[in-house]
């Protein structure tokens, strides 16, 4: 099992000191899962990158269904993968082409979508099955034009709490398995995102128990598809039960999106495990890679805290 730390092409390598490999070796880290962009990757990051996390567009369905929001080109790319179906295919292809320069073991793609008008809502107008089927259609089209009809690296589809692949059970996975037409794919299980989907997660112990209960219910073929785990948790049930349901309404779209950032952080907390019982989750899932997806300036300290619990 390889232990990776999350980092981004938008940040330099300063947190890892003058000799990043020495720092990583000292903390028990085998390399970086690098968040990439739509541009060529920086040379400074390439030696330390073992896997990549491709850029995510929050509401790509708006562009795919040709009902784009009014926003500038840069925001359209990051929030919708562009404005048209052709843009969506082109921008995902571009992101994958640039990420391939890292020669990664795999590349993570979020499989979820939320209407931008509903970012601060409890209920969403989309259903999971439609989102999964549609994203399969998009990815099939993207990959069909690649050499041999396969992606340049294994695509790992990641679960979210927004409509799409949630993995609270196997239903969304079954749709994905039926509709993806290429072979080189797998699942990135994000334990933190799953805890946002599950009820009554008030404490770390609640999270561990609920994750074990859910994951122990997975079939062998689903577990065999889980090649990597984003390892962290959220204990945000109290917040999820109490926040004010706020659709965009007449609010300016940019203001609404900005106002949603603290809401999203309140849901998806990216907390490091501190209880050694968390290792039982990885014993069930048996991934090849574990990415300790920590947030904040102290992300290395959080990595060390969680890594110390695992053999």
Where are the language model's segments positioned?
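Hydrophobic faces of well-ordered beta-strands that scaffold small-molecule active sites
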Residues: 2-9, 30-34, 47-54, 107-109, ...
């Amino acid at each position: 099992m390889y232990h990776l730390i999350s980092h981004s092409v938008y940040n330099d390598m300063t947190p890892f000191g003058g000799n990043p490999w020495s720092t990583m070796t000292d903390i028990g880290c085998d390399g970086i899962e690098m968040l990439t962009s739509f541009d060529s990757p920086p040379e400074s990051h390439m030696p330390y990158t073992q896997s990549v996390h491709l850029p995510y567009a929050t509401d790509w369905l708006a562009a795919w269904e040709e009902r784009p929001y009014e926003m500038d080109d840069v925001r359209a790319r990051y929030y919708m993968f562009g404005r048209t179906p052709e843009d969506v295919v082109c921008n995902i292809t571009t992101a994958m082409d640039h990420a391939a320069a890292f020669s990664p073991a795999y590349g993570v793609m979020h499989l979820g979508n939320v209407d931008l008008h509903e970012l601060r809502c409890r209920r969403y107008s989309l259903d999971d099955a439609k989102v999964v089927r549609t994203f399969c259609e998009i990815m099939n089209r993207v990959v069909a034009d690649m050499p041999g009809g396969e992606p340049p690296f294994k695509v790992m589809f990641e679960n979210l709490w927004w409509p799409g692949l949630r993995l609270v059970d196997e239903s969304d996975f079954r749709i994905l398995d039926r509709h993806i037409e290429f072979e080189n794919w797998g699942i990135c299980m994000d334990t933190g995102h799953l805890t946002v989907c599950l009820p009554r997660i008030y404490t770390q112990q609640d999270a561990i128990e609920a994750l074990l209960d859910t994951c122990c219910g997975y079939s062998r073929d689903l577990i065999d598809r889980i090649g990597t785990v984003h390892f962290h948790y959220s204990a945000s049930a109290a917040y999820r039960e109490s926040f004010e349901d706020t659709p965009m309404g007449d609010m300016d779209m940019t203001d609404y999106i900005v106002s949603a950032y603290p809401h999203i952080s309140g849901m998806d907390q990216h907390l490091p495990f501190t209880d050694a019982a968390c290792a039982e989750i990885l014993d069930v899932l048996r991934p090849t890679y574990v990415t300790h997806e920590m947030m904040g300036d102290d992300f290395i300290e959080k990595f060390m805290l969680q890594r110390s619990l695992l053999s």
